[in-house]
Amino acid sequence: MHATTIITVRKGGKVVMAGDGQVSLGQTVMKGNARKVRRLSKGDVIAGFAGATADAFTLLERLEAKLEQYPDQLMRAAVELAKDWRTNKYLRNLEAMMLVADRTVTLAITGNGDVLEPEHGTIAIGSGGNYAFAAARALMDSDKSAEEIARRALEIAGDICVYTNHNVVVETLDAE
């Protein structure tokens, strides 16, 4: 997935999701201040997406509907979305990935039907995801806060990945 980097860090009673703002079309930067991290479900869930923007918005709308159907059950809503995404002929062609988090869980949702919970308190997606993930993992044992780790990881990813910029949007929730 090109065009962005999204990371989630869970540490010190906080869950932070951060994403850059670059939108690319081929080799051209079309926009530098897109908002790819947002709140859902009355602010109780944060979500970030990488991939085709229209596809991601379709999936965010579907996730919002699943959260209304299964209130306060992010895992259940994510699994139901992943099942629909994988089995629905229309949705199957959508090209995006999502990170979602609430007070209790962080999940990556893919079009392959995967719903993955990170093992080490952090997970990242997108073209710069591997760089951000490695940077965050290296910083998890430091005295930095979850937000500081997320911002630094995106800064490093933005220095390396041509599809990631330094215009960072951050959303934070209290974690359990």
UniProtKB/Swiss-Prot annotation:
Matching CDD domains: protease_HslV
Naturally occurring in which organism (per UniProt): Rhizobium meliloti (strain 1021) (Ensifer meliloti)
Keywords, comma-separated and alphabetical: Allosteric enzyme, Cytoplasm, Hydrolase, Metal-binding, Protease, Sodium, Threonine protease
Entry EC number(s): 3.4.25.2
UniProt xrefs under Gene3D superfamilies: Glutamine Phosphoribosylpyrophosphate, subunit 1, domain 1
Regulation: Allosterically activated by HslU binding.
Gene Ontology biological process terms from the UniProt entry: proteolysis involved in protein catabolic process
Compartment annotation: Cytoplasm
Binding site for Na(+): G158, C161, T164
Subunit structure: A double ring-shaped homohexamer of HslV is capped on each side by a ring-shaped HslU homohexamer. The assembly of the HslU/HslV complex is dependent on binding of ATP.
PROSITE patterns: PROTEASOME_BETA_2
Protein name listed in UniProt: ATP-dependent protease subunit HslV
Enzymatic reactions: ATP-dependent cleavage of peptide bonds with broad specificity
Active site: T4
